[in-house]
């Protein structure tokens, strides 16, 4: 693991590693070693411009290979959860070597990056707010609708609930 992440890991693998957590370990010592190895891999210095290019290329590849299924695919649609996650992962990767915060949860990462002054405060606040909104709406849609169902076809009361969850007066897709 340590050798691979030092010599061979691509940026997308490091992006995924920002979300890694040890679920089970055979001993507390092994857990500490695993957590330490993750932190070392993430805290290596990296070129911000190269990292930005890599992240943008991976996002484009995802969009080409697995596009969103419409406006209500809150994860994959442009501006959706994946874009917010990629922004948080990018900022963590480029600032970690200088002691920037690392957090597995995207909302916590954005908040920590904001507190550390590692990005435009208004942009980070907007990303965090959008992430929370999309989390709330995603949960509501998962509970209320079958996969692939279009909220536009739902009864007026359900659309009003979506509008309220989204903090707007009325529902319009």
Give residue spans per PLM region.
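A nucleotide- and high-energy phosphate-metabolite-utilizing enzyme signature
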Residues: 1-173
